[in-house]
Amino acid sequence: MSVVSNTSLEHALREGANALGLDLSEAQITQLLDFLALLQKWNKVYNLTAVRDPQEMLTHHLLDSLAAVPPLRRHVARRGQGGAIHLGARLLDVGSGGGLPGVVFAICCPEVDVSCVDTVAKKAAFIQQAAGTLGLSNLHGIHARVETLAGPFDVVSCRAFAALADFTAWSRQALAPHGVWLAMKGKHPHDEIAALPADVSVFHVEQLTVPGLQAERCILWLRPVA
């Protein structure tokens, strides 16, 4: 990648972060750009994403994932004040693929310990490699089916992974007693919400605006109902 394209990507990342109200350190900006470079470098080998263009990767993957960081930070801060989530909170990102949004969460929320699980070994290996390359001691790649993980995790997240009913059913045993699910979706999934079992509740829906992306995005927060 040329110096010009590097500069262009950095400018777009900084503008996008500002538009999202994200206060990122210089180290975090560098880590995000280095992660983007890793995605580009290993994509052909690991088949991490169908997106090949660096600018499109930035918009559709990096900024799309960054849009979920402010809601996650607010949740961690709120629960931390209540004593349920604290420094070292654990997050499980399900079906993480190339590490989206899990790696982005690990970079932007260093107080959160992030585990990215995927059934494809080479994708989990890529995340583990990214953790080492980026110096992220709070990031772990796990090759497993989510149903086999015991947790407990304070937050279980996914992005374009599965229907809500499947996502919550498969990952429920990994959720801590006070834990919540964070599901990143496109359009508001009315049908998926209607199909949820009675013991799963959607307690908050947030509409997201992704800089440079003309598409609907939202986050759903869910929790088990006793």
Curated annotation (Swiss-Prot):
Q: Write one Gene Ontology MF term.
A: rRNA (guanine-N7-)-methyltransferase activity
Q: Does the UniProt entry include the keyword Manganese?
A: no
One GO CC term of this entry? cytosol
Taxonomically, the superkingdom here is: Bacteria
Which EC numbers characterise this protein's activity in its record?
2.1.1.170
Annotated S-adenosyl-L-methionine binding lies at 95, 100, 146-147, 159
Q: What subcellular locations does the record give?
A: Cytoplasm
UniProt keyword list: Cytoplasm, Methyltransferase, rRNA processing, S-adenosyl-L-methionine, Transferase
Main location group:
cytoplasm
Catalysis: reaction(s)? guanosine(527) in 16S rRNA + S-adenosyl-L-methionine = N(7)-methylguanosine(527) in 16S rRNA + S-adenosyl-L-homocysteine
Instruction: Write down the Pfam families for this protein, in alphabetical order.
Output: GidB
Q: Does the entry feature the keyword Hydrolase, yes or no?
A: no
What protein family does this chain belong to? Answer: Belongs to the methyltransferase superfamily. RNA methyltransferase RsmG family.
Name of protein: Ribosomal RNA small subunit methyltransferase G
* Species in which this protein is naturally found: Acidovorax ebreus (strain TPSY) (Diaphorobacter sp. (strain TPSY))
What high-level taxonomic lineage is stated for the organism? Bacteria, Pseudomonadati, Pseudomonadota, Betaproteobacteria, Burkholderiales
